[in-house]
Amino acid sequence: MKTTKEQQNGEMKDNNLPQDVANQTESVNESRRRFAKSSLAVSGVLLTLASRPSLGSGGGFGGGGMCKSPSGLMSGNLSVHGSPQRCSGRTPGYWGNHGGGGPQPNAWPSPYLPGSCQKKCTNSSNWSNGTKFSSVFNCNGNGSRYNNYSLMQVLWLGGRGDPYQLGAHIVAALLNAQKGWTPVLTVAQVKNIFNEWNDKGYFEPTAGIKWYAADIVYYLKSTMPE
C-alpha cells in the first residue's frame, strides 16, 4: 500500500492505492511509450497528443483538463480555440476512498452504491453488497473476471486481479460520467467502450482503429485530471 498526498484548493488530498496501482500511476512515461507503440500509433494525431505534457501536468491531452471523446480524438482536430471541452473526472483512487468505508461516505452518485466495509477497506474482499459490476456491464466474454465483483471491489482488485487496471478505470469513468464531470463521455458511452472490449478484446473509436486494454486506460486517464 502506498499513500500519496496532493495539494488541491488549499487542502491535502489523500490517495490510497494498492502498491501496483501507485507504481502504474508513477510510470507515466512508460505508459506514453507503450501508447505510442500500440495500434493507436496508426494515427499521427495520437502520436502528437502522446508527445504533449503528461496527464499529471493538469490532466487531459495537452494539460489543463482538456479532453476529447474517443471519436473526437481520432478526428485530427487539435485546435484549442473556441470552447474546448474540459473534464474534471476523478481517479479510481478517489472513488475507492469516497465510498461506504472512505473519509467521505456515500459520496457515489445515484443509482450506484459502494457497499459497506468494516475494516481494511483497501482490500477488495472486505467489501460487501454494493452495485454489481455485471449489473452495469457485460461480463460474458473478456470481462468475465469481473463477473462476481461489485463496482467497489473492482476498484480495489489491484493489478493482478485487474490487468492494466481496466476495470478500475472503467468504474471511475462510469461514476465520473454519472456526476457530469466528463462532458465528452456519457454513461452510455462508457458502457459501450467496456462492452465492446468484452465482446472483441478491443474497442474501435473509429472504424479500423483498435484500442486494447492498455490503450483504453490511457484514454480514460485523460478524462481524470483531478
Identify the function of each model-found stretch.
Residues M1-E30, T48:
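N-terminal secretory signal peptides
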Residues K5-Q8, N16, F35-L40, L55, ...:
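Sequence-pattern detector for short linear motifs
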Residues G10, N15, S38, G44-L47, ...:
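Intrinsic-disorder/low-complexity peptide segments enriched for small residues
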Residues A22-N23, S43, G82, G158:
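A general structural-boundary detector
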Residues N23, S27-V28, R32-L55:
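N-terminal export signals
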Residues G58-E226:
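Soluble extracellular-acting proteins and domains
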